[in-house]
A protein has these predicted regions:
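Extracellular glycan-modifying ectodomains
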Residues: 1-270
Length: 270
């Protein structure tokens, strides 16, 4: 929200640096030819043309405008694999008044806010003909995912869903059954997904992917036997213990020889 409406920030919180994490990662991903969408610039343009607010005044998260984002995302995903994902259709936003907006609860106020902002809702339909297919999707990211459930009939859009919330807590299925990350089979869950979508909002880019990329590389490309050999080699070369070497590998998987040239990430399935 602060990236879309920086003009509402107090002067002390204005970004005066020359470094923009969104532009930085967008440039790197583009240079690597990695499929991604950078939506901040879209919404910054939309805020001057839409007759509605991109974000509600009383909420940190997007609401009806998330439908535009998810429509773009699923179209983008479909173009990558020509999967046949169902189409998202929506009309004009309809205004309604919220009696209590979710993020008001986080302010710890003695009295509720009197002048609440008007929010909007989209009537959303999912179109699926005989040739369409609903994908299984694994999402890894922050709390902006919950609008997918609140604003769209996600059971009509996807066959199944799994959410790795901040790459820590896991929610499986449309009923969001909770698991701890350590209790799931990470390799199996990644391989059964038709799509893996990592997403984040601007103010969290300093945490990059919440270690998801590092864990995915090790899970997909490094067998237990290779980890054993490489941890011993690195421990000997650095004069540290094997346990310390494993910790370093988890932070920097590129220390393992050949992992960055892993064109076929199925070594763990041998």
């Amino acid at each position: 929200k602060a990236y879309i409406y920086p003009e509402y920030l107090p002067e002390r919180d204005r970004d005066t640096t020359m470094f923009n994490t969104i532009e930085y990662y967008d440039k790197l991903l583009t240079e690597a030819n990695f499929p991604h969408i950078e939506m901040t610039k879209w919404f910054k343009t939309m805020k001057d043309t839409l007759p509605y607010p991109i974000f509600p005044t009383m909420d940190n998260h997007w609401q009806f405008t998330s439908v535009y984002a998810y429509d773009s995302l699923f179209r983008f995903m479909d173009n990558l694999k020509h999967f046949g994902i169902p189409k998202i259709k929506y009309g004009e936003p309809q205004a309604y008044d919220l009696k209590f907006q979710s993020d008001e609860a986080t302010l710890n106020l003695l009295f509720p806010v009197r002048d609440k902002s008007t929010d909007y809702k989209l009537d959303v339909e999912i179109e699926c003909n005989d040739s369409c297919r609903k994908p299984q999707v694994l999402f890894v990211g922050d709390s902006f995912i919950w609008a997918l459930n609140e604003q769209l009939p996600w059971e009509k859009l996807m066959e199944d869903i799994e959410i790795w919330f901040y790459n820590s807590d896991v929610y499986k299925g449309f009923d969001r059954k909770p698991y701890k990350k350590d209790d799931i089979n990470m390799l199996r869950d990644m391989l059964k997904a038709d799509y893996i979508v990592f997403y984040t909002s601007g103010h969290l880019w300093h945490r990059a992917t919440y270690d998801f990329v590092e864990q995915a590389l090790l899970t997909l490309c490094v067998s237990d036997s290779l980890m054993e050999v490489e941890s011993i080699r690195i421990a000997d070369s650095l004069g540290i213990s094997k346990e310390e070497a494993i910790a370093k590998i988890k932070d920097y998987p590129g220390m393992i020889r050949g992992i960055m040239n892993c064109d076929n990430p199925s070594i763990r399935n041998e």
